[in-house]
Amino acid sequence: MANTAAESITPAHVFHIDRTLYTGRPADLTGRPEKEKVTYDLLDKLGIAYQRLDHDPTATIEACHDIDALLETEICKNLFLRNAQKNSFYLLMIPGCKKFRTAVLSKQIGSARLSFAEPEFMEQYLNITPGSVSVLGLMNDKENRVRLLIDRDILEQEFLGCHPCINTSSLKIRTSDIVNIFLPYIGHSY
């Protein structure tokens, strides 16, 4: 009997999630990147409580749907944008299910021709890579080169989901802790 096309397709990788919802940082940080450790250090220093899931790398918001369900909150869609001159940078936080409309945002903030910023700018200003974009990366923007834009729907949620500057873990954090503790501490506003 011949194989059908569907039978011959094998997934290149099965996405794995450690289904345990942890409170706080990992007990063993061996093998974790420094930028992740520094993120936990700052959250702990500020007294910001968080829950954590560990998982395979997530490169897209679509890959986060199972994580959303386990965290019982929606992972934010974090878009790192720039203007045409490459001298103004923006981190936009919107609900994962919301469509991004460049023209609408451009008009709202008075910046024509927005586009996605290149990975080298993510690394330079936020010390993150594509797939790991997070509000927590703003702790690395010491010169406030990146303007934070938060969708009203995010601000109305009790919790938000984000990465600790690496896309192999996701955190559930009170939105009010990000807005009232984290952002003032790092000198950013929205």
Question: What annotation goes with each model-predicted range?
Answer:
Residues 2-190:
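Extended, low-hydrophobicity, polar/charged segments
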